[in-house]
Amino acid sequence: MKDLFRRAPKRFTAARIENQAIPDNMWVKCPSCGDLIYTRQFSDNLKVCKCGYHMRLTAREWLGLLDDGSFVEFDAALASVDALGFVSPRHVYEQKLIESRQQTGLNDALITSSGAINGMLLCLAVTEFEFIGGSMGSAYGERLARVIERAADARLPLLTINASGGARQEEGTLALLQMAKVNMALTRLAAAGQPHIALLVDPCYGGVLASYTSVADVIIAEPGARVGFAGRRVIEQTIRQKLPVHFQTAEFLLDHGMIDMVTPRSELRGVLSTLLRLYRDAFAHTSAAQHVPALTHVQG
């Protein structure tokens, strides 16, 4: 998937078939319009349907934004533990951690790294939604705080890619305190004169939105991404009113001044390159620029 974001999106044909079983690995059915799309064409189009629906990418697929050979991962072994011995009628947290690690091949829901986009160095944090809903627990928060500290020390911008259900309920207060810890680390990044660019992808909710993503210098969202604190159904049940059809979508947030831009996936790498270049050039004219270390990448 390393070339995912370097391919020119292609036009593709789709067949509208209702309630038909889909052979494994041959076709993808769009959850939005119901069209069947040939898998290879769907991948060539960055997993975006012709109707505009953006299918969720894995954390590893998002790493395709980076230049070839620039990815250097941090803290891959850092993992959450079941400190509270959490058990609910639906699941045992310790077993859920084991299953998520087997399913995703990751130790937790966040990958952190250094890398480059069009030759411009940066630090990156990207969530894996398939790992317990991309929820922020103690290991997630620690990984994120560490990569922010690395970015501040190395005078590098930070890009976060966020698809999350929020703080991890199985870790209780241990998860909630990560919100404050991460935002404190971001004050160091700001003091170093470096930007935090947050990309919100579907879905982005709860403590992840309420902490570090909502205070980013630039907030970008993919088209149609659902973004909010509490879910739509919870709000409707609480206020006993129907919400607008497009409530909590990226477009709704843009119209109400909550985010800076809505960017299709095919344009994302170019937009990020432009933003990184603007911030780099602005930083070069500050007095802090003389303290920037000469790096090829951030050391782990």
UniProtKB/Swiss-Prot annotation:
Pathway: Lipid metabolism; malonyl-CoA biosynthesis; malonyl-CoA from acetyl-CoA: step 1/1. The gene is accD1. InterPro entries: AcCoA_carboxyl_beta, Acetyl_CoA_COase_Trfase_b_su, ClpP/crotonase-like_dom_sf, COA_CT_N, Znf-ACC. Zn(2+) binds at residues 30, 33, 49, 51. This is Acetyl-coenzyme A carboxylase carboxyl transferase subunit beta 1. It comes from Roseiflexus sp. (strain RS-1). Its EC number is 2.1.3.15. Pfam families: Carboxyl_trans, Zn_ribbon_ACC. Keywords: ATP-binding, Cytoplasm, Fatty acid biosynthesis, Fatty acid metabolism, Lipid biosynthesis, Lipid metabolism, Metal-binding, Nucleotide-binding, Transferase, Zinc, Zinc-finger. Acetyl-CoA carboxylase is a heterohexamer composed of biotin carboxyl carrier protein (AccB), biotin carboxylase (AccC) and two subunits each of ACCase subunit alpha (AccA) and ACCase subunit beta (AccD). One of its GO terms (molecular function) is acetyl-CoA carboxylase activity. Coiled coil: none annotated. Residues 26-294 form the CoA carboxyltransferase N-terminal domain.
